[in-house]
Amino acid sequence: MFHVSFRYIFGIPPLILVLLPVASSDCDFSGKDGGAYQNVLMVSIDDLDNMINFDSNCLNNEPNFFKKHSCDDNKEASFLNRAARKLKQFLKMNISDDFKLHLSTVSQGTLTLLNCTSKGKGRKPPSLGEAQPTKNLEENKSLKEQRKQNDLCFLKILLQKIKTCWNKILRGITEH
């Protein structure tokens, strides 16, 4: 009996076959000199950082988003693309116009500099879920405040990671 497996025919370890699509990126960096980042995005990121009241226990809670998405080698563009799209969700919050302006600048500026092509996947609209029982007014207020604090913690961490990722990319570009 003649037993030949796929990996021996083509000489490719199976791990590479699994990791190959993840490492490839459909983004092209524009503004490779870093000027647009330094002069526009960095300023808005710093302004947003200063606007957010930082709570010391924010850093102890790492959200699942960062466990699933990180700025690892060859994944920088993918991380920044997801992070910029995540920033857009914060525009729906009840925040000041100045805050929205900086948030929009960072989100749109990042997406513009990355120049990513969309994959055209259709998204399923979020379900409304089951009706929740109403709670008393005090509980609702405290839950809203807690949620807002968690959102601001997440935003603060996200901005720091975006900044770190951009710096990593620009260091890599200047070295080559």
From Swiss-Prot:
Signal peptide feature range: 1-25
A Gene Ontology molecular function term of the record: cytokine activity
The protein's assembly and partners: Interacts with IL7R and CSF2RG.
Main location: secreted
Bridged cysteine pairs (disulfide): C27-C165, C58-C153, C71-C116
Source organism per UniProt: Ovis aries (Sheep)
UniProt protein name: Interleukin-7
InterPro entries in the cross-refs: IL-7, IL-7/IL-9_CS, IL7_sf
Pfam families, per database record: IL7
Gene Ontology cellular component annotations, sorted alphabetically: extracellular space
Region of interest (Disordered), ranges: 119-142
Domain of life: Eukaryota
UniProt keyword terms in alphabetical order: Cytokine, Disulfide bond, Glycoprotein, Growth factor, Secreted, Signal
